[in-house]
A protein has these predicted regions:
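ABC family nucleotide-binding domain
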Residues: 5-208, 212-215
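Short, Lys/Arg-enriched, disordered terminal segments
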Residues: 1-3
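Basic, Gly/Ser/Thr-rich N-terminal segments that form RNA-phosphate-binding interfaces in CRISPR RAMP
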Residues: 222
């Protein structure tokens, strides 16, 4: 794991009307680090993840990915940067029901015009590593909850991003499948070198993460 920060944020403030959700957040996240973000509901965890993912902007503060100041990017540049560098996983798998799991995984690469001749070989390896190769031709309704979420993770990885941001990814899974999904994050990190930032209420995942950030009332604490 490199000590050089992949993500560096300083003084992040986010307001919604008169409500201050983030209050001067400073953080750095290293390459290949798995970071858990924990805290009570309403603490600002999802808002922080949205800002780190560049889908929302802070009212104050700065955000750098290595040497790139993402706050200075125009809308088109920012969209391109996000497609290439950031993957997202949510509590709901958000797989489109009319497409097969394989087609769902490919969508971000197709939309971002990032599909190459190596994509199929990469997916074959990825599906094999995740234990879902035999299920890739099925539609989401034919899959178990654990399988659906694994394909959602594969979709987040399709463009080989530097970082994967996950918001309660195991929140809808039973204990067994939640543990399988958490184990998968570490396997993928070790194989492909991604950084994972995971909002979670799961104490096992928080304890196993390389580092845990505690967010309360919009502030990071010990």
């Amino acid at each position: 794991m490199s000590d050089a920060p992949l993500i560096q944020a300083e003084g992040l403030v986010k307001n919604y009307g008169t409500l201050t959700v983030l209050r001067g957040i400073d953080l750095h996240i290293r390459r290949e680090e798995i970071v858990a973000v924990v805290g009570p509901s309403g603490a600002g965890k999802s808002t922080l993840l949205h800002i780190l993912g560049t889908v929302d902007k802070p009212d104050k503060g700065s955000l750098h990915y290595e040497q790139t100041d993402v706050m200075r990017l125009g809308d088109r540049e920012l969209s391109r940067f996000r497609n290439r560098n950031i993957g997202f996983v949510y509590q709901q798998h958000q797989l489109l029901p009319e497409f097969s799991a394989h087609e769902n995984v490919l969508l971000p690469a197709m939309i971002g015009d990032l599909q190459t001749r190596e994509t199929d070989a990469y997916l074959d390896e990825l599906f094999g590593l995740m234990g879902i190769k035999a299920r890739a031709g099925h539609r989401p309704s034919q899959l178990s909850g654990g399988e659906q979420q694994r394909f959602a993770v594969a979709r987040a990885l399709i463009n080989r991003p530097k970082v994967v941001l996950a918001d309660e990814p195991s929140g809808n899974l039973d204990t067994y499948h939640a543990r399988q999904l958490h184990e998968l994050f570490f396997t993928l990190r070790d194989r492909y070198g991604q950084t994972f930032v995971i909002v979670t209420h799961n104490p096992e995942l928080a304890a196993r993460a390389d580092r845990t950030l505690h967010l309360t009332d919009g502030q990071l604490g010990p």
